[in-house]
Amino acid sequence: MKHYFRTESILEKERCECCGKELISMKGRCMICRENPVLVSTDGVIPLFSYRLWNRELMFRWKSQEEREFSPIFARLLYEGLRKTGDRVLVPVPPRKGKIRKKGWDQIEELCSFLENRYGFRVLRILVRNTSNQQKKLSRTQRLESTKSAYSLCSGQLLEHALKPFSGHLPENLCLIDDVCTTGSTLESCAAILKEAGAKKVRAFTLFTVD
């Protein structure tokens, strides 16, 4: 596994400054982000690897077959990327309603727990998901539409408690954590909410991107 993922190349390849997909023959933004941008509030997505071949198989084994021994490995890979950008305050993308009850665990929360307890990152668990729809079953257009109101800030005492270590204020620089970036609509929705709440810069890190 250590030799399969070459973390030395993280952030070194030419990528789209918006969605993070690798660029081959252009600079700055990919064609999709130039012609039909989704990521407006998001200050760039950094996916570590492409969601292809064995990467797809590993994700299936981790998420669907619950092989949780991959969690510390994936957390280490995220750490390798995050330490190069200097992002220190992480916001996990929340699961759909009922997922934890059905599966018994949340993969993104587990990643963030490793990043918090093993590598010293601060984790702000302040986003909630309002729907139980599975995004993977939707088309691109449906995904973009469904995420507009799918997320929100946690409210009341939960938010107050989460922000207490930060003197009650939302940090200006935040980094979203998710497993796969497909259309970018989920990350964009979450980033927009965080900026409305006062964040100045919201980057996103994902394990994989669908390209």
Predicted regions and their residues:
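Glycine-rich phosphate/pyrophosphate-handling loop used in enzymes and phosphotransfer proteins
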Residues: 1-211
